A protein has these predicted regions:
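Glycine-rich beta-alpha junction loops
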Residues: 36, 107, 166-171, 196, ...
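Metabolite-binding pocket within alpha/beta catalytic cores that recognizes anionic/polar moieties
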Residues: 1-143, 147
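Active-site rim beta-loop-alpha module in soluble metabolic enzymes
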Residues: 139-184
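Short, hinge-like loop/turn segments at secondary-structure boundaries
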Residues: 118-121, 208-209, 227-229
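Short acidic/His/Gly/Ser-rich catalytic and metal-binding motifs that mark active-site loops
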Residues: 127-129, 173-175, 217-222
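A C-terminal functional module that forms or caps the active site or interfaces directly
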Residues: 177-180, 185-209, 213-217
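His/Asp/Glu-rich mid-to-C-terminal helical/loop segments that flank catalytic regions of hydrolases
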Residues: 218-242
Length: 242
């Protein structure tokens, strides 16, 4: 049986997130997932976050409570890839999260996209496996929270680009041929989580918001690292938090 026929909405899952974690009293309604250690360490240094729980999706990862502008957030790091990040989101929902915000990096498929831009995905090409266990098969999954997130960025006067993303499981098999096909379909970036987490969002009926940071580029015969100046990136990240 092909993986695209793996969705089973007729029977219950054998292992549920509540088998791994318990609901936490007064758990913040909004949870934030980040990938970069440097950004996470900055938050810890600036705001003195306290541990309120642990993620158990493969690794024991601390969850912290972040207090900012009289609001409380749960924040944790997640691993690269759709399966691990989907598992992390599942456990946060089981603990009590009502909304999830995910911030990560991506590779651009269009060299004309200026490095350092934030990107808001509007749809994700499902070149991974996790999403097919949560929703019916399709080439793309719509990011239903994209419109609201674009409005928020506009209100904050934060420049961004919106468009389709290519979600892949195979970091080292992003071939020139597949890159060109995704570009022809309108994809502007590639990453490894969007399709998976948006499938979780739809299945669990929990809004998940994602924005990305355009970093390296695949638009060419060879990979272009194209790293943005660290100080500029840090300033943009602080602006998002504020």
């Amino acid at each position: 049986m092909s993986i695209i026929n793996a969705f089973d909405n007729e029977t219950k899952e054998i292992l549920h997130p509540t088998n791994m974690v318990n609901k936490i009293e007064h758990f913040p309604e909004v949870a934030i997932l980040v990938f970069k250690e440097k950004f996470f360490n900055y938050l810890q240094e600036e705001y003195g976050m306290k541990i309120i729980g642990y993620i158990n999706a493969g690794l024991s990862i601390p969850i912290y409570k972040l207090k900012f502008n009289n609001k409380e957030f749960a924040i944790t790091r997640t691993t690269i890839g759709g399966a691990g990040t989907a598992g992390t989101a599942e456990e946060l929902i089981a603990m009590g999260a009502k909304k999830i915000l995910i911030y990560g990096t991506c590779g651009t498929l269009n060299k004309e996209i200026l490095k350092g831009h934030f990107v808001i995905p509007t749809a994700a090409y499902r070149d991974e496996g996790t999403s097919y266990h949560y929703i019916e098969p399709s080439d793309y999954i719509e990011v239903k929270t994209a419109s609201k997130l674009c409005t928020i960025f506009d209100e904050l006067n934060i420049p961004f680009i919106k468009g389709k993303t290519w979600t892949t499981d195979a970091l080292y098999r992003e071939t020139i041929g597949n890159m060109k096909k995704r570009k022809e379909e309108g994809c502007i970036v590639v990453e490894m989580e969007c399709a998976s987490i948006m499938a979780v969002s739809q299945f669990r009926n929990i809004p998940i918001y994602q924005f990305l940071f355009g970093d390296d580029t695949l638009d060419g015969p060879e990979w272009d690292k194209r790293k943005i100046d660290a100080s500029s990136k840090e300033l943009m990240e602080r602006n998002i938090l504020e």
